[in-house]
Amino acid sequence: MRKIIRVKRTLPIKGITSAGDLYKLAERLGVHIDKIVVLDEAGSLPEKGSYIILLKGPNSDVGHWTSRYNDEYFDSMGVRPPSIIKCRKWNDVQYQSTYGEYCGPWCLAFLLSKQQNKDILKSFYDLD
C-alpha cells in the first residue's frame, strides 16, 4: 500500500523583495493591496486605499518600500513621508535597522494591522 505524503508549500519571507514578491506574500497573508507604485506616482493615488510605495532615486536599481493606508503613512525606518505623499499621520518608530532589508514585509505587517484593526506592530515597539 502506498502512503501519500502531502507537502505544504511555504513562501519564504525574503529581505529584498520585488513587487511580485509582495503581491504573493500579501495573498498568503490575506492582505489587500490596491496598488504598488513608485514615488512619482504616489501623489495621484486616491485618498482611501492600501498602497505600497517604492522610494528610490531616478538612477537607482534599488529602493525602500513604504506603505499608506488611507491617510496614514508607514516607513519601517520611522521617517515622515516625502511631500508628494499627503498623509495626516505617520509613524516615528524605527522597526528595522538602517541596513535592514525587510522593509517590504514590514509594510505588509502595517497594512495587515490596519485592515484587521489590530495593532500587531505594538509587540515590536520596545524590543531593545
Predicted regions and their residues:
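Short, solvent-exposed coil/turn linker segments
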Residues: 35-42, 75, 115, 119
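Alpha-helix initiation/capping motif
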Residues: 18, 38-41, 81-85, 126
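Cysteine protease catalytic domains with a Cys-His-Asp triad
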Residues: 1-66
